């Protein structure tokens, strides 16, 4: 029979109606001769009642054979429950079953289909189709669908054009490693899966599209963590003839629309703006979490005269004050934080506690001469814990920024109901890479430099600033954008500053440089990480929880066993040969 409605949508208004439902058996209970079944579908749970006095012996026998995750079809009359269940939207009603059909049976599942399970991540991914039956996973993906629907409606209203760009593209050097796809037809040549549609969307501006968007899959072969995946989705925008502020206004409107339609939250516009240098100085991060205080305090000049060379001779000394937390952290706890500090390049972590108005701790004796000045500078009070790092400015900021976030989580200082958006602006154009031994693009090599600093492309690259902007939410980079270079000579200077020879630039980006000979308009845009945005809206800590079929931290899929070896014939067709070892053999 045709399904009347979803089980999770049956309400008191349906009492007395005969309906047909289809779904999965969640739980089965025998009470006083009656059989109670929780029927589950994507919209929720409905209680079924099977009374031996009101059904045939065949229906009763079928009901007694049911096990968890059997797929069934039931017909019956909606009735009011004697005792309502306030925890369920359907809790005021139940279905008195008159007909029951088993559509499919099921083996015992490797974990219960319910929220709050304790199965490990790889087991959940191995049986992802079962994991996705759980209500919280269904809700996460329904939220994701609502977010994308809201985004599309908003951008369509603003006359953005949805354009698909190629997945098989050209490998270019800047950024993370590419996923390469060998060409069978052009032997020895490779496509790259795009890390973003950056260049193609810029070319669409040259083609006169004016406003482009795409909700697009992107690929990066990089080390994974909780908010990264080898394939991810971004909301990609590009516009012509707009200023930085106009692009930001459009983005703020988009986020405000999504927040209102999916969370019922009215966000305050415009979002705050913070310069990159201020974010690093005060929060130790280019993606500051502004939901709590505990700002970094610069003490470099204050400690210059102390008889402690670690402080007095350090390029930079900063501290964070953990208010009233002296008793929360033992020496052993602080030793653990010291190990965290070392992960960020710090040689150690100095600390003092304020006890009865005095400084106590390993370095307190070196600070007696400046205790009053230090107390004033840090606004110290009894029971405060002070953590110091002395090193290069980069190490100091990174270390204290990481400790700041860790401590806030441990002490419950973060209001998880807050959504604090802000723009980080006035970025450096380049950042120094110790690994590469050269300057790299902080964003990408197509970013427009600020006019007053562009002359440093042939001078001190550290002084070049970009017309770039990142949007940050609760300590996560939600997205980033910039105005782009549209003048050929400036783009060539940018490539040269990054170490490209003329030949290399033409080989890698010649098509873009050629396009700049044909009236390339001023343009700029932005991309928002959809997975990360939905993760934060859903209150999750890992983007796997909002992606239907993600990879694990080894970039593998435990369900399909991808990536896998392939037949030797396939490799021969591609003119490829794999060096074999015990862990990597072709079939």
From Swiss-Prot:
Keyword entries, A-Z: Aminoacyl-tRNA synthetase, ATP-binding, Cytoplasm, Ligase, Nucleotide-binding, Protein biosynthesis
Spans traversing the lipid bilayer: none
PROSITE patterns: AA_TRNA_LIGASE_II (PS50862)
Subcellular location: Cytoplasm
GO cellular component terms given for this protein: cytoplasm
Keyword Ligase: yes
Location of region: Aspartate: 198-201
Xref: Pfam families: GAD, tRNA-synt_2, tRNA_anti-codon
Catalysed reactions, semicolon-separated: tRNA(Asp) + L-aspartate + ATP = L-aspartyl-tRNA(Asp) + AMP + diphosphate
Residues involved in L-aspartate binding: 174, 220, 443, 484
Predominant cellular place of this UniProt entry's protein: cytoplasm
Name of the protein in its database record: Aspartate--tRNA ligase
Organism: Streptococcus pneumoniae (strain P1031)
Classification of source organism: Bacteria, Bacillati, Bacillota, Bacilli, Lactobacillales
């Amino acid at each position: 029979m045709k399904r009347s409605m979803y089980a999770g949508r049956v309400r008191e208004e349906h009492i007395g109606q005969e309906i047909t439902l289809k779904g999965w058996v969640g739980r089965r209970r025998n009470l006083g001769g009656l059989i109670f079944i929780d029927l589950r579908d994507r919209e929720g749970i409905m209680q079924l009642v099977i009374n031996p006095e009101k059904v045939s012996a065949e229906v009763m026998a079928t009901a007694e054979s049911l096990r968890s995750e059997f797929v069934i079809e039931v017909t019956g009359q909606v009735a009011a429950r004697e005792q309502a269940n306030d925890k369920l939207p359907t809790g005021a009603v139940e279905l008195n079953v008159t007909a029951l059909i088993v559509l499919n049976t099921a083996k015992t599942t490797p974990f219960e289909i319910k929220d709050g399970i304790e199965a490990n991540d790889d087991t959940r991914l191995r049986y992802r189709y079962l994991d996705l039956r759980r209500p919280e996973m269904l809700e996460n993906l329904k939220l994701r669908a609502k977010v994308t629907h809201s985004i599309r409606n908003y951008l369509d209203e603003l006359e953005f054009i949805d354009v698909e760009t190629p997945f098989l593209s050209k490998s270019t050097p800047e950024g993370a490693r590419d996923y390469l796809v060998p060409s069978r037809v052009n032997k020895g040549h490779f496509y790259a899966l795009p890390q973003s549609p950056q260049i193609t969307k810029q070319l669409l501006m040259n083609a006169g599209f004016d406003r482009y968007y795409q909700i697009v899959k992107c690929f990066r072969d990089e080390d994974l963590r909780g908010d990264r995946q080898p394939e991810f989705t971004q909301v990609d925008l590009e516009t012509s003839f707009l200023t930085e502020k106009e692009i930001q206004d459009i983005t703020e409107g988009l986020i405000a629309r999504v927040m209102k339609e999916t969370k019922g939250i009215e966000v305050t516009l415009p979002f705050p703006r913070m310069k990159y240098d201020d974010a690093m100085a005060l929060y130790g991060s280019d993606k500051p979490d502004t939901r709590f205080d505990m700002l970094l305090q610069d003490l470099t000049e204050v400690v210059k005269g102390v008889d402690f060379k670690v402080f007095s001779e350090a390029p930079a000394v900063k501290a964070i004050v953990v208010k009233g937390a002296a008793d929360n952290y033992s020496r052993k706890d602080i030793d653990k934080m010291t190990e965290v500090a070392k992960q960020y390049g710090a040689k150690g972590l100095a600390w003092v506690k304020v006890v009865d108005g005095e400084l106590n701790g390993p370095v307190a004796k070196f600070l007696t001469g400046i205790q009053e000045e230090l107390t004033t500078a840090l606004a110290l009070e009894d029971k405060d814990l002070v953590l110091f790092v002395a090193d290069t400015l980069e190490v100091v900021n990174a270390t204290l920024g990481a400790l700041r976030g860790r401590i806030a989580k441990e002490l419950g200082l973060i209001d998880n109901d807050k959504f604090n958006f802000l723009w980080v602006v006035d970025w450096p154009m380049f950042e120094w890479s110790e690994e590469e031994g050269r300057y790299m693009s902080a964003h990408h090599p197509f970013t427009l430099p600020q006019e007053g600093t562009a002359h440093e492309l042939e001078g001190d690259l550290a002084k070049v600033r970009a017309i770039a902007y990142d949007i940050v939410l609760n300590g996560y980079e939600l997205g980033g954008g910039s105005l782009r270079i549209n003048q050929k000579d400036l783009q060539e200077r940018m490539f040269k500053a990054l170490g490209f020879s003329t030949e290399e630039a033409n080989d890698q980006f010649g098509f873009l440089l050629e396009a700049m000979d044909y009236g390339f308009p001023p343009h700029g845009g932005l991309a928002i990480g959809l997975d990360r945005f939905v993760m934060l809206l859903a209150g999750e800590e890992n983007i796997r929880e909002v992606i239907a079929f993600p990879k694990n931290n080894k970039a593998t899929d435990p369900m399909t066993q991808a990536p896998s070896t392939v037949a030797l014939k396939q490799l021969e067709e591609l003119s490829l040969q794999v060096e074999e070892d015990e862990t990597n053999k072709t079939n």
